[in-house]
Amino acid sequence: MEEFQGYLELDRSRXHYLLYPLLFREYIYALAHDHGLNRSMLFENAXDDXKSSSIIVKRLITRMYQQNPLIFSAKDSIQNQFFGHNKNLYSQILSEGFAVIVEXPISLRFLFSLERKEIAKSYNLRSIHSIFSFLEDKFTHLDYVSDVLIPYHIHLEILXQTLRYWVKDASSLHLLRFFLHDYWNSFITPKKHITFFLKGNPRLFLFLYNSHICEYEYIFPFLRNQSSHLRSTSSGIFXERIYFYVKIEHFVKVFFDNNFQCILWFLKDPFMHYVRYQAKFXVASKDTPLLMNKWKCYLVNLWQYHFSVWFQPGRIDINQLCKYSIYFLGYRSSVRLNSSVVRSQMLENLXLINNAMKKFETIVPIIPLIGSLYKSNFCNTFGHPISQPTRTHSSDSDIIDRFLRICRNLSHYHSGSSKKKSLYRVKYILRLSCVKTLARKHKRTVRTFVKRLGSEFLEEFLTEEEVVLSLIFPRTYSTSRRLYRGQIWXLDITSINDLANYE
């Protein structure tokens, strides 16, 4: 990585980066996969012992420019071994290289802007669970929420124009545009092709999508500061996660050139809160639905006139928080009213006082989670555990370690659930699926294999939180009930579990 950064430092004096030559450096693809140069996960199923080298990249670029993707047919793909059978494989290599190369100048520019403006990094924002602590603190005092799916560009050139601000190298942009045009049909063809494109090119797609989302989020801190004239509590989050200060002067010019200052009075709301993960965001407010409708109209006009994205206003619903649940990051979150009756007596008069308190609840939706287990072949459609024949060739320790790791990761991620009974069912499915896989490997019945393993095997499926807490606190009934059933937000989770990502 030092060599990569040193290469970019050589060209910083010219105020742009020459990224095109980096496509022919082998260490770029080693960085992309976190593997050595002699081994790559891309070629596990390949018939030949190929390596990601500059020769392969040169061949791919040459064939891409020679072929016309608009007249490329299925018959040609069968006849052309390189651009047919190996097209997806080589394109996956190139997409990984693109992702690493294009990410680097943006990261360096962001770090340079932090050093210049002396903005301190907020390391506590790296955990996904910090979002739920924010929701617990803020959403219990709010009344209305809009849960919105972010629209995506309908034309590729709009996305390419967005990238021109970040990447100044014309050669890299031209090749990237050509590469995207070759695969753009995957977005307008059936769903299976889209799924293949996303799975085959995850890093490049995430970078392109996040660059698209950042264009929306630039505007929110600026609008909030301009409209409410109060210090924005969320500006520090945006300043770290996106590059707000880089484009603030540009957006000031855009808004005042287009007479946007005349509608800023609609948005004077110091209680507006915004949170986003992946392709969904929620906007919540304490005021009346009238203000939420004004925000709704503004967002639709912003997407249509400034980002050329068509979006139907009817798809943005305004709901009361006390009557609505938000499906967010593998949780079903809601604000519930808990009533508590207090008995008060003064002299001979007896009064009952009913106190209503808001509580932020996070529940694990068991049906989608079991659906994820079904897709991963841990159970059938009814939730009954099944064995995994593909794992029978592994050793017993590897099979047990894999199931334990999945079980602990799921339990660790969903430790903030206010109702953990559904997690016990997930543990049961994973535990019995592990036993059935081992019994199938040794050609024995499940009953005899469980007797052979004993109760010690079942105790291994305790979560890490239960093991640590059992060593610190006594296992009394009151302590166990308070600790194991309470919400535990772990601030070391940087990515959502694959099984929990069923949205």
Swiss-Prot record:
Q: Which GO terms describe its molecular function?
A: RNA binding
Is Ribosomal protein there in the keyword field? no
Which GO cellular component terms are attached? chloroplast
Do you know which InterPro entries this protein is assigned to?
Domain_X, Maturase_MatK, Maturase_MatK_N
Alphabetical UniProt keywords: Chloroplast, mRNA processing, Plastid, RNA-binding, tRNA processing
Location relative to the cell: Plastid, Chloroplast
Q: Which family does it belong to?
A: Belongs to the intron maturase 2 family. MatK subfamily.
**HAMAP family linked:** MatK
Give the protein's recorded name.
Answer: Maturase K
Give the originating organism: Kunzea baxteri (Scarlet kunzea)
Gene from which the chain derives: matK
